[in-house]
C-alpha cells in the first residue's frame, strides 16, 4: 500500500506539472526553476525509465537553450501565443481534435463527479490542462480512498478519462504541436507527456484489481 501511495503522489505531481505547462505562459521565475537542483533531479529520475529517456533528453536540450535565450520569458510567451492562442493555433481543446460533443462529455463527467473547475480555469473544460488536472485529482482520490471498493472506483474513473478522452485526442495534438514549434520547448514537453500517458495507461492496467472468478 505504501508503494501505491508513493506512486500515486508522483503520478499526480506529473499530471499537475504538465497541466501547468500547457495552461498558462511561464514567468521568468518559473523558467529559472528549470535550472534548479529539484527540477534537474526530477527530470533525471524520469530518464531512468527507458521509454522516457529520449523524450527527457530532448526536453533537457530545449531547457538548456531556453535558459540562455535572450528575453526568455517574453520569447517563450510568444511561442505559447503562436502555438496555442493565435488564429491558426494548435488548439489545446479536445473538441478541436475529436468532435464538438467532447466538450459536453467533459461537462457531464465533471458534473457526475461533482467537481467544479471554474474557479481555477477560465478555459472550456475540454482544455488539455483541465483534463490533466482532473487526472491528478482522481489519482489522489484513489490514494485516499477509505475502502478497496472506493479505490477501485477511482482507478476506473482514471482509466475512463485516460482512454475516453486524453489518449483519444492527445496524439493529434502532440504531432501538431511538435510540427508547429520551431524552438522546441513545448514540442519536447508534448512528446514527454505523450510517453507518460502511454506508460500511465499501462500502469493502470496492471494496478486495477483482477475481475472476480465465477
UniProtKB/Swiss-Prot annotation:
GO cellular component, as recorded: cytoplasm
Question: What are the record keywords, sorted?
Answer: Chaperone, Cytoplasm
Q: Which Pfam families match?
A: Nitrate_red_del (PF02613)
Record has Chaperone as a keyword: yes
Question: Which biological processes are named by the entry's GO terms?
Answer: protein complex oligomerization; protein folding
Q: Which SUPFAM superfamilies match?
A: TorD-like
Its subcellular locations are: Cytoplasm
Q: What task does this protein carry out?
A: Involved in the biogenesis of TorA. Acts on TorA before the insertion of the molybdenum cofactor and, as a result, probably favors a conformation of the apoenzyme that is competent for acquiring the cofactor.
PANTHER family referenced in this protein's UniProt entry, alphabetically? CHAPERONE PROTEIN TORD, CHAPERONE PROTEIN YCDY
What is stated as this protein's family in its record?
A: Belongs to the TorD/DmsD family. TorD subfamily.
- The name of this protein is Chaperone protein TorD
**Gene name in the database record:** torD
